[in-house]
Amino acid sequence: MARVKRGVTTRARHKKVIALAKGYRGRSKNCYRAALQRLEKALAYAYRDRRARKRDFRSLWIVRINAAAGLYGLRYSEFMHGVSLCSIGLNRKMLAEMAVRDKGAFEKIAHAAAQACGRTCVVAQSNS
């Protein structure tokens, strides 16, 4: 049987790692061992932060909804409770977008949510 030398596969593996590490600073972009370590850490961060991004966006949506609901005298929890009582099928992402882009529609939802909770909706005067 012929002897198998691993030079070709090793070179290919090293090239792949170096290509993925393109754009890194220092030795991490062209030294295989440093690039491999940096790449493993980068992929671990990417995996972790893909999950963290979902939490971050949900927090952002809640902050935006709370701020917009506050203009109508409602707390976030009261607003969301009223929305669920009214069977309004909008998720937090859509409600947050409406709070930013379509204030008129959000106002109608806020009034409906306030009525469902048995609260009176107070419209705050805005300076803008």
UniProtKB/Swiss-Prot annotation:
Gene3D superfamilies reported for this sequence: 6.10.160.10, Ribosomal protein L20
GO cellular-component term (any): ribonucleoprotein complex
Any one GO MF annotation of this record: rRNA binding
InterPro entries the record matches: Ribosomal_bL20, RIBOSOMAL_L20_CS, Ribosomal_protein_bL20_C
Pfam families from the UniProt entry: Ribosomal_L20
One example of a Gene Ontology biological process annotation: translation
Stretches assigned to coiled coil: none
Annotated keywords: Ribonucleoprotein, Ribosomal protein, RNA-binding, rRNA-binding
HAMAP family on file: Ribosomal_bL20
Similarity annotation: Belongs to the bacterial ribosomal protein bL20 family.
NCBIfam families per record: rplT_bact
General function of this protein: Binds directly to 23S ribosomal RNA and is necessary for the in vitro assembly process of the 50S ribosomal subunit. It is not involved in the protein synthesizing functions of that subunit.
Name of the protein described by the UniProt record: Large ribosomal subunit protein bL20
UniProt source species: Anaplasma phagocytophilum (strain HZ)
